[in-house]
């Protein structure tokens, strides 16, 4: 990302792994959507904070990129050691701040920590209009619809994100002013640990203990 000045940076922070045949983070859909978007906007860069080789049963991302003829210079990955051993909070925040938008259109989330981390840094989100995500994005973010997909392992429905809808959301994000979103920052503050503790946990514990 050091060479990303003047570029439109699309970020994704997700584990590249699968449960059986289910790749919940939707890497293939997201990468195809980016390939379509990049043809119109060659100034776009995709940063994937993940293991590119999918050593936990995920995709071989370089193969995915090659199948879609995405130029190597249009995609960035973290340093392998940094990814394996973790980054300092300040370094991770610097990555989030460098994004113009976070792509988080997974099949479903129970919470989706990167979604909230990105917004705390002022970065808006493109998320799935499914499961917990609609409750976890600010009003100036974007939600993507898709096709319901049955997951027998969890006995529940997920959603496969619609690729043209992801492309459209990227176009909307590209058309917006660049820079931090104060709306996203203010929204994320409601999920700060001290706020959640005082606003929700203390009253709940008080009721349970009376």
Model-derived features: where do they sit?
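Short hydrophobic beta-strand element within catalytic cores of glycosyltransferases
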Residues: 115, 124-127, 137, 142-143
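Aromatic "clamp/platform" in nucleotide-sugar-dependent glycosyltransferases that forms part
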Residues: 107
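A charged, aromatic-enriched C-terminal amphipathic alpha-helix characteristic of glycosyltransferases
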Residues: 161, 165, 175-205
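Conserved donor-binding/catalytic core segment of Leloir-type glycosyltransferases
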Residues: 2-25, 31-34, 38, 47-48
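Nucleotide-activated donor-binding/catalytic signature segment of Leloir-type glycosyltransferases, i.e.
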Residues: 58-94
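A short alpha->beta transition loop at the rim of the catalytic pocket in nucleotide-sugar-dependent
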Residues: 100, 120-122, 129
């Amino acid at each position: 990302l050091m060479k990303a000045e003047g570029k439109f940076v699309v970020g994704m922070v997700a584990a590249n792994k699968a449960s059986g045949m289910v790749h919940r983070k939707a890497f293939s859909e997201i990468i195809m959507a980016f390939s379509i978007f990049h043809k119109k906007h060659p100034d776009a860069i995709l940063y994937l904070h993940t293991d590119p080789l999918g050593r936990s049963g995920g995709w071989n991302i370089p193969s995915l990129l090659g199948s879609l003829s995405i130029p190597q210079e249009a995609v960035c990955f973290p340093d392998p050691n940094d990814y394996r051993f973790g980054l300092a909070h300040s370094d991770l925040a610097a990555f989030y701040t460098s994004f113009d938008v976070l792509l988080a259109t997974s099949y479903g989330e129970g919470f989706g920590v990167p979604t909230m981390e990105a917004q705390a840094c002022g970065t808006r989100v493109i998320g799935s209009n499914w499961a917990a995500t609609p409750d976890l994005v600010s009003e100036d973010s974007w939600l993507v619809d898709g096709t319901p997909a049955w997951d027998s392992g969890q006995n529940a429905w997920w959603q496969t994100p619609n690729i043209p809808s992801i492309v459209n959301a990227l176009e909307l994000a590209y058309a917006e002013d660049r820079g931090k979103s104060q709306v996203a920052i203010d929204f994320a503050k409601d999920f700060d640990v001290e706020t959640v503790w005082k606003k929700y946990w203390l009253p709940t514990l008080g009721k349970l203990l009376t």
